[in-house]
C-alpha cells in the first residue's frame, strides 16, 4: 500500500499532506488548488 508520492508542484488533496514526498501540501499562489511543497 506504499504508492509513489507526489512530487513538488503536483496537485494534492488539502487534507492529505503525506500524499506528497515532502509531506507538505500547500495552497497554490495563483490557482485555486493545492500543490505539494
Swiss-Prot record:
Domain comment quoted from the record: The presence of a 'disulfide through disulfide knot' structurally defines this protein as a knottin.
Entry-linked InterPro entries: Tryp_inh
Keywords: Disulfide bond, Knottin, Protease inhibitor, Serine protease inhibitor
Keyword Transcription regulation: no
Pfam families assigned: Tryp_inh
The keyword GTP-binding appears for this protein: no
Site (Reactive bond for trypsin): 32-33
Protein name: Trypsin inhibitor 1
Family named by the database record: Belongs to the Mirabilis serine proteinase inhibitor family.
Domain of life according to the entry: Eukaryota
UniProt GO MF annotations: serine-type endopeptidase inhibitor activity
Disulfide bond sites: 5-21, 12-25, 20-36
Function (record text): Trypsin inhibitor.
Amino acid at each position: 500500500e506504499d504508492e509513489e508520492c507526489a512530487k513538488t508542484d503536483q496537485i494534492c488533496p488539502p487534507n492529505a499532506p503525506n500524499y506528497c514526498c515532502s509531506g507538505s501540501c500547500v495552497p497554490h499562489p495563483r490557482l485555486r488548488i493545492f500543490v505539494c511543497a
